[in-house]
Amino acid sequence: MSACVWSRRQFLKIAGRTAGMTAAGGAGLLAGSFPRILRAASATGNVATVAIASGASPADNARRAVDAIGGINTFVSRGDLVVLKPNIGWDRTPEQAADTNPDVVIALAEMCLSAGAKEVRVFDRSCNEPRRCYINSGIQQAVEEFAKKHHAGDSLRLYHVEDRKFQRTDIPGALALNQWDLYRDALEADKIINIPVAKHHTLAGVTLALKNMMGVMGGNRGQIHFRLPDCLVDINRRIPPRRAVIDATRILMRNGPSGGNLADVKAVGKVVASSDLVAADVVAADRFFGLGPDDVPHIRAALAAGLGVTSPAGIRAVEV
């Protein structure tokens, strides 16, 4: 059975003709807007650090970004069951930038295992045919080759999502979703690391860490797009990843989330990491798309809800 209900696809096509907020891919990276986040960083009080690593190696960028926010050992403990939640939603190659770069996924898996994780599980609820998504994204091959090389077949596993493992879950204090079918592996994990690819989204404007958690939702996800900002707050509150590592190796600047045309892709060579998903999204939206919180309704909603930082003034962005 296809993981995404057809009504969601229809909805996205309709939204592409009507949504007023899009990221202008032709403008390239609006780096000039980013210093406003740096200047806004509070000198006192609780500050969320967001690290941006640049370089030719996606794996090295992931490691340096995570090290800059305290390192994997401040998060993963010996014996933990860790879920890595990349984007594997689309039947696209790494060059097309619709899915998370496999080198970033493997770097995170290696870090977690080195920190003593008992098991690392990698999965996503794909929109295209799941087996094609897993294979053509390069993630399946990368996981299998790493596990074989390091004799980690029992500790690093790539899973296809199974309908039977979605369970109806209450969401206390919900803004919009009092209940939803959520994936059991995510509910039972000791730690979750959210590993989206940064890209344009026809309806939401951009899709980063907050929206990537739709991959743990069952049912007809198209329904939530009518109250998307509040629903994303609810899902991230119920299953709160404590680390976001945003892959910006190659960015789909327009015609997302599925893309397919290399002309829509920009090579950027960066990885963003934070222990605060909202802060990570604020910085990534600004850095790569020139969008502030008021331009992205679900980021604005997450700030207002206190899901993480409540203002860009609480963010300290560092280049590494």
Each language-model region and where it sits:
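N-terminal and secondary-structure boundary signal
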Residues: 2-320
